[in-house]
Amino acid sequence: VKARLDAKTNTKTDAGNDGNIKLKRAWAEGKYGATVVRLGKFPVFTEQGVLFDGEMSGAGLTLGADRTVSATLYAGRYNLEDSAWGDEITEAKEAGTYTGGTTANMQGITLNWDPSERFHLGVDYLRLGNNKLLTGMMDVKDPLNYYGVGITYRPVQTVYLSGGYWKTNSHESAEIKKEHMKSYNIELGYKGADESDPGSFGVYAAYRYIGGMGTIAPTFDGAMWNTKGWEIGGQYTVLKNVV
């Protein structure tokens, strides 16, 4: 069984920011050869973290772990207040313009092909459903179906180039579809910080488009939701497990 607790603290007053400790995730995991089974509230990370990097409640299954061809399947429930759209949903609830539930059914699969240490190919499919919220409040199709593909190439061990494109379906106007129903990511990086290796570091330059409905919970810190542009950054491991 694995778990993670999150808490906020104010170092100036040595007090918690909100007085609460939250259970971020807790799940049971079993590994049987190249098969991994997860049950509970567990993390999901799609290809390059563009579509989704977060926690969901349900079941997950990885087939072919650490092999050339692998697949990760997951199904369960996800609270959309934790998504990139969370602020808009919370504001609508507080204003009384939305009174329905915020939990969606979510199912997905990520297929991976790693023929060598230099090349990786990943394919995503994700289905998200909550009729009252998606259709009633956000005026998009229910369910939403996301699909996309990403690749990573390493010409040498310390340099990588990755890119990918993701899209969703909806019945919105052509103009809104054109501007908001897709996401893409292009990134060039050198090395990378290893949380178990103090002193390790990485730098990167990327051009990303995080479409308003083209992603659910993206992983990026610098690229904001519903924006397009350059991101330049890096990571450094100060101490073990401190990046």
Residue spans of the language-model regions?
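A conserved mid-domain beta-alpha-beta active-site/ligand-binding segment of alpha/beta enzyme cores
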Residues: 124-128, 133-135
